[in-house]
């Protein structure tokens, strides 16, 4: 008998364990839905792979012809963005149920079933859509709103038809217009999912006749599912918003914060929803009812029980609330918590989420004002009252209510450290932002203030007395000093917290840890063509794949390691753990991005982020986006002529003038945020707009500077912190210019090697020291033969780099001083003869002034390539004097010949150094 009982007990335990294994998500321990199993191939495909597959699909649809190649690429790009946005679920209980429903609907179509993959999207919108690639996405918002399994099956069957009938490729085949602006790009993306009325009717008809009618599901589905779609913008239920939800015994909100009545919920049958994927609900409802007329039978639940489906729906609803907290939809999150708490009063997640919503609202109002709440007239039903109330709340009132809500959550969940952290933060906020301190809050209520003594000179029931009574009541009950009176009376712990955390002792900001690495997460790169319009998808994708390497190099330059969560890295992993971490980092980043760090707060996703910090040893995040706009600027004839005249007048600028007229114009904008992931505090951010192409060096250095400033609180000096560059140059000068001065020249162009050392002073300025050597020949007056001249020039130049570029990267201009050493000899002297120079010395030192223009390119963060032009004004008089009979007597012929010869030499040096064009290559050693 005992053995039998033991056997029964073991059997019960085994069943319980099996049930627990099948239900890993228990509502009372909910922290968010996660994916399970190996990462599907759909989520790891590159744009290149997807585009090649889509081109073949388009050929198959059009009898071998590839129509609208650009639109096919746009479809591939948008799907690639969708599958890598970190909001896709796979292998979780909801997705598995959707897959099982599809198995049931397609039991007679195994080939079609094999072509389909199903995923759930972490989105609160009520929607589902199919793609031409065989992926069907169901938003959690739809699962959260459907009433039973049959309604979900109807929607799935509908979406299967969109794939089966190739509606995506039909739309692409018809559409020939390319979007020419970001707004039109979004319209095209929405239109890609926006089917025509005929397609919707076809999906309804065939979905019913091919799949649904032959399934075991309830044939009375049409009314229920279209009710769900009709009221898709409504919360999970209706709960009346009364002042009792917010008033305390001694502190009440003004009557003006509450509407006399709310706008009744209006049907959406006739709503012209041009951005909806499934418009015209009324006609679809009638059409579906007509098809199902005469059919009967079926069950609302086939694969699940009502209790199991309710649990799945609850998971979807809680995840929707969680997503609303992430994306700053605090009013909707709070209201849906109220709805669910009516049934699940002790659910820890709902209690915490309700407090988080009010906490987030108070923080938003404190730091951003009225932007925190949407206008209440945009909503109907009972939730309208909550939008009105939250919109009316002042920042200090919202903070007081949030503190009360957090304290109530703390009492229910005393071991939840995250709630404690928010409560303590809110008490500090009351002190620092709203100038409140513990002494401001009364422990007893002044009843005399609430019930003023009657005036013997007036009638107690008179209307003026009632006005005065209302005024006195308002002045007491709306007074924030009574906001915590009941808590102070009932709980000494609250009084202790008030005194401990509502003080000037603001926790010191802890700097970033130098021994922990940097999270590299999904950097974005967008290249647009402003001439043809739209995004250059393939170039954007290619550059985006290179961007993680640039971030890693920038971090390495700051002696930091990187933990790479970019899309290319995701494709190299198979395990769900990495994918779920990718999603967690994405959610934390999205929550941060709602305010871009302008609202310091305890983020709802911080517990997940803390786990990532511990797992990967990184506590900083580098967020990076690059936008490059290409445009071919047509130069007018007048502008071109003017530029050429300018270049001719200032001959050294001629190469740059030609480059301006011939080159493609680009503008590059880099956005970089360096964030402390322990607190969400922005350590540094920079937005740079540069009217040049998006070189790797430019982007890498902007990220490096962002990280450097975040770690050191000061700007770096020099490209990637390197202050010294050394280069070897080959320069060309043009003796041809001597024809302006002499009637003969030795050669037209001369080569002069040079060495350049450049030292960076600050971000945009540097000192450059040049030394070049030129063996040349000169025709000098009074010397019948060519003279051999060995010129050594030193140039000390102050440089300024343009458009915010960091020295020594990018275009520059400079000015400085020169010193030319000229060693002269004759051909005979070179051959060993002692024949002297006539009227000249063997050595000359001649100073000068210089201006220069150039540009440096940097490759691999080490190699420098440069080109430039410099113009030198030699400080020696090159003009030969003329003597007449009046002064010939006072000047000896010897002196006259010496002067003319010397100035002839100066003329040679002038023209030799007048214009020099150089090309060089060097290194950044330090």
Protein language model features and the residues they cover:
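Outer-membrane beta-barrel translocator domains and adjoining extracellular loop/strand segments
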Residues: 237-239, 636-640, 738-744, 779-785, ...
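C-terminal/domain-edge helix-coil "capping" segments
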Residues: 200, 490-520, 525-531, 602-605, ...
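A Zn2+-metalloprotease active-site environment signal
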Residues: 22-507
């Amino acid at each position: 008998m005992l053995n039998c009982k033991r056997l029964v007990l073991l059997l019960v335990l085994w069943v319980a364990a099996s049930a627990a294994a099948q239900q890993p998500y228990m509502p009372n321990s909910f922290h968010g839905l996660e994916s399970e199993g190996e990462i599907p191939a759909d989520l790891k495909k590159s744009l290149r792979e997807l585009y090649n597959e889509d081109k073949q699909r388009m050929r198959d649809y059009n009898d071998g012809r590839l129509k609208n190649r650009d639109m096919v690429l746009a479809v591939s790009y948008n799907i690639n963005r969708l599958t890598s946005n970190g909001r896709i679920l796979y292998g979780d209980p909801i997705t598995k149920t959707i897959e099982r429903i599809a198995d049931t609907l397609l039991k007679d179509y195994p080939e079609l079933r094999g072509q389909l993959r199903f995923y759930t999207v972490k989105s609160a919108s009520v929607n589902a859509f199919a793609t031409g690639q065989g992926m069907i996405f169901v938003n959690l918002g739809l699962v959260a709103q459907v009433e039973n399994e049959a309604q979900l099956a109807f929607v799935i069957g509908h979406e299967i038809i969109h794939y089966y009938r190739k509606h995506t490729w039909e739309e692409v085949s018809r559409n020939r217009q390319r979007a020419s602006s970001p707004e039109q790009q979004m319209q095209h993306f929405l239109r890609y999912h926006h089917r025509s009325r005929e397609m919707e009717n076809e999906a309804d008809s065939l979905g019913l006749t091919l799949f649904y009618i032959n399934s075991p599901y309830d044939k009375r589905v049409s009314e229920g599912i279209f009710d769900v779609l009709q009221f898709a913008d409504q919360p999970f239920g209706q709960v009346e918003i009364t002042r009792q939800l917010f008033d305390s015994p001694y502190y009440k909100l003004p009557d003006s914060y509450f509407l006399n009545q709310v706008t009744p919920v209006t049907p959406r049958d006739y709503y012209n929803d041009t951005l909806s994927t499934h418009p015209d609900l009324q006609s679809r409802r009638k059409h579906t009812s007509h098809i199902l007329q005469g059919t009967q039978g079926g069950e609302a639940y086939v694969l699940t029980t009502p209790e199991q489906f309710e649990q799945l729906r609850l998971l979807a609803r809680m995840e929707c609330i969680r997503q609303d907290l992430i994306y700053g939809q605090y009013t909707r999150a709070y209201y849906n918590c109220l709805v669910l708490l009516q049934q699940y009063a002790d659910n820890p997640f709902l209690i915490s989420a309700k407090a988080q919503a009010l906490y987030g609202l108070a923080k938003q109002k404190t730091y951003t004002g009225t932007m925190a709440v949407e206008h209440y007239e945009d909503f109907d039903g009972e939730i309208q009252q909550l939008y009105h109330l939250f919109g009316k709340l002042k920042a200090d009132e919202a903070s007081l209510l949030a503190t009360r809500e957090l304290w109530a959550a703390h009492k229910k969940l005393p071991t939840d450290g995250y709630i404690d952290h928010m409560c303590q933060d809110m008490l500090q906020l009351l002190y620092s932002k709203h100038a409140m301190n513990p002494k401001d809050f009364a422990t007893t209520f002044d009843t005399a203030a609430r019930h003023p003594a009657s005036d013997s000179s007036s009638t107690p029931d008179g209307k003026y007395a009632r006005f005065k009574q209302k005024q006195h009541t308002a002045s007491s009950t709306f007074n924030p000093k009574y906001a915590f009176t009941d808590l102070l009376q009932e709980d000494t712990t609250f009084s202790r917290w008030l005194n401990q955390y509502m003080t000037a002792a603001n926790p010191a900001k802890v700097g970033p840890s130098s021994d922990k690495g940097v999270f590299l997460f999904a950097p974005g790169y967008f290249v647009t063509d402003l001439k043809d319009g739209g995004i250059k998808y393939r170039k954007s994708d290619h550059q985006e794949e290179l961007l993680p390497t640039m971030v890693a190099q920038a971090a390495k330059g700051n002696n930091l390691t990187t933990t790479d969560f970019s899309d290319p890295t995701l494709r190299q992993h198979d395990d769900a753990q990495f994918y779920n971490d990718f999603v967690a980092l994405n959610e934390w980043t999205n929550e941060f991005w709602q305010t871009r760090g302008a609202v310091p707060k305890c983020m709802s996703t911080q517990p997940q982020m803390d786990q990532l910090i511990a797992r990967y040893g990184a506590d900083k995040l580098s967020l990076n986006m690059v936008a490059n706009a290409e445009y071919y600027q047509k130069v007018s004839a007048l502008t071109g002529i003017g530029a050429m005249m300018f270049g001719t007048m200032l001959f050294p600028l001629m190469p740059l003038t030609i480059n301006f007229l011939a080159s493609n114009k680009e503008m590059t904008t880099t956005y970089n945020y360096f964030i402390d992931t322990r607190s969400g505090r922005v350590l540094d951010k920079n937005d740079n707009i540069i009217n040049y192409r998006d070189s790797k060096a430019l982007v890498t250095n902007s990220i490096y500077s962002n990280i450097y400033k975040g770690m050191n609180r000061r700007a770096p000096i020099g490209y990637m912190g390197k202050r010294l560059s050394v280069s070897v140059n080959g320069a060309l000068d043009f003796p041809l210019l001597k024809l302006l001065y002499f009637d003969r020249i030795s050669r037209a162009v001369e080569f002069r090697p040079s060495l350049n050392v450049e030292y960076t002073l600050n971000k945009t300025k540097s000192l450059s020291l040049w030394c070049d050597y030129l063996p040349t020949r000169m025709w000098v007056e009074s010397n019948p033969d060519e003279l051999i001249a060995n010129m050594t020039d030193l140039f000390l130049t102050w440089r300024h780099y343009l458009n915010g570029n960091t020295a020594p990267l990018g275009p520059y201009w400079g000015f400085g001083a020169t010193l030319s050493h000229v060693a002269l000899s004759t051909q005979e002297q070179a051959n060993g003869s002692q024949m002297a120079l006539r009227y000249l010395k063997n050595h000359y030192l001649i100073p000068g002034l210089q201006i220069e223009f150039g540009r440096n390119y940097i490759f691999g963060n080490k190699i420098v390539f440069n080109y430039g032009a410099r113009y030198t004004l030699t400080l020696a008089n090159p003009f030969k004097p003329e003597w007449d009979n009046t002064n010939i007597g006072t000047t000896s012929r010897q002196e006259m010949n010496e002067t003319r010869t010397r100035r002839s030499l100066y003329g040679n040096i002038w023209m030799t150094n007048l214009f020099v064009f150089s090309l060089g290559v060097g290194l950044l050693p330090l």
